Amino acid sequence: MPAKYWYLAEGYTGGDFDTYVLIMNPNDTATKVDVNYLLPGGGIKAVSYQVAAHSRYTIHADSIGGLTNTEFSTALTGDLPVICERAMYFSMPR
C-alpha cells in the first residue's frame, strides 16, 4: 500500500555487499522523495530524489558519498504516497 513515510531496517555497503533502495511512484504526477540514511553513531546522510509518475527509481546505496563501507537504516518521506523496498545482495566467493 502506498504511503508517505517508509522505514527500512538494515543496509550495508561493506565487503561484497550491495544495497539498493527502490522507490515506486504509482501517482499520475512526479514526486519528490527525501531519503535519510541513518548511520552508526547518530549521523545522517540526507539526499532527495525526483521520481517520475508511474515509474520506479533505483538507488545504489554503495555509490553515495558517505555510505562507503558502512551499515545504515533508511527513512524515506514522499511528497505523495510511494512504495519502497530495500534489496541487499552478497557475492559469495566460489
Task: Kindly give the residue locations of the regions a language model identified.
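Gly/Pro-rich, tryptophan- and cysteine-flecked surface segments typical
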Residues: 1-94
